[in-house]
């Protein structure tokens, strides 16, 4: 019987998850089924769709926007990183029938940074722009690599203070940042609107990597802005997407996919 997986979302037609997981299955040498499931934007509809899929033998599921908080509530138990994130992007069915809720977003970021881009995070000064769900989901995995410091900056400073307080790290107002960071990560939604965050341009002086968690076929507005103002290297979040998918796949199947080759495939397709 071919194992079945899905991704729940709304919208979901754009999701690259089926393609990514089929690449992973090719690496493992197995057949899987991976579908997209469009769900209406209510808790009842999400719960019904998730319950139906899992009761019918679904071997695992991914969850994308806007359902990560619904997924957290639906899960029977949670990983430490899901608890830290307050959101779930992966369901892992357990042998006892319970559903483990995990969040692989932060691991996806770290895998892209460390395995794919070759960045050493230990001892680095990291700035995280944004204080929403995207930012919260990556803090714990970043801290696990023992950076010298991790600072959260946000347009609404009180939200940065609130998130920083959860993890006992630093917060800073977005417009009062100083040029003292090795790595700057954009977890705001600015690139969705084709704009860079409202930050002082000189913060990129001395920065060797400016990383946008958003991805696109061409350099994002954040990447362009960072490069123009001194960032030595820029990257988008495609590798994070592949990395979080790989972390989920490994939990489901016990097979660790190679992410670099999949990223190359996706880049080549985007360039066609």
Please annotate each region the language model reported:
Residues 123, 213-272:
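Adenosine-phosphate binding glycine-rich loop
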Residues 65-70, 132-134, 189-192, 216:
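Short glycine-rich anion-binding loops that position phosphate/pyrophosphate groups of nucleotides
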Residues 24-37, 111-128, 180-182, 201-211, ...:
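Mobile, glycine- and charge-enriched loop segments
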Residues 2-117:
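Phosphate/diphosphate ligand-binding glycine-rich loop within oxidoreductases
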């Amino acid at each position: 019987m071919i194992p079945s997986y899905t991704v729940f979302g709304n919208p979901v037609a754009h999701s690259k998850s089926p393609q990514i997981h089929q690449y992973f299955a090719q690496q493992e040498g197995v057949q899987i089924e991976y579908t997209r499931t469009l769900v209406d934007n209510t808790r009842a509809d999400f719960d019904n769709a998730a319950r139906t899929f899992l009761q019918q033998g679904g071997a695992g599921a991914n969850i994308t926007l806007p359902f990560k908080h619904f997924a957290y509530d639906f899960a029977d138990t949670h990983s430490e990183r899901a608890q830290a994130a307050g959101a779930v992007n992966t369901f892992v069915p357990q042998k006892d029938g319970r559903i483990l809720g995990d969040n692989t977003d932060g691991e996806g970021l770290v895998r892209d940074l460390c395995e794919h881009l070759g960045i050493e995070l230990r001892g680095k000064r990291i700035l995280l722009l944004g204080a929403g769900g995207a930012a919260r989901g990556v803090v714990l995995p970043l801290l696990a690599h023992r950076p010298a410091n991790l600072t959260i900056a946000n347009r609404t400073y009180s939200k940065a203070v609130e998130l920083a307080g959860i993890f006992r790290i630093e917060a800073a107002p977005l417009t009062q940042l100083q040029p003292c960071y090795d790595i700057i990560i954009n977890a705001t939604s600015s690139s969705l609107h084709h704009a860079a965050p409202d930050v002082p341009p000189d913060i990129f002086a001395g920065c060797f990597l400016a990383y946008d968690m958003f991805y696109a076929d061409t350099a994002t507005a954040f990447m362009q802005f960072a490069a123009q103002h001194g960032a030595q290297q820029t990257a988008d979040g495609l590798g994070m997407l592949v990395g979080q998918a790989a972390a989920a796949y490994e939990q489901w199947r016990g097979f660790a996919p190679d992410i670099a080759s999949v990223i190359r495939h996706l880049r080549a397709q985007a360039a066609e």
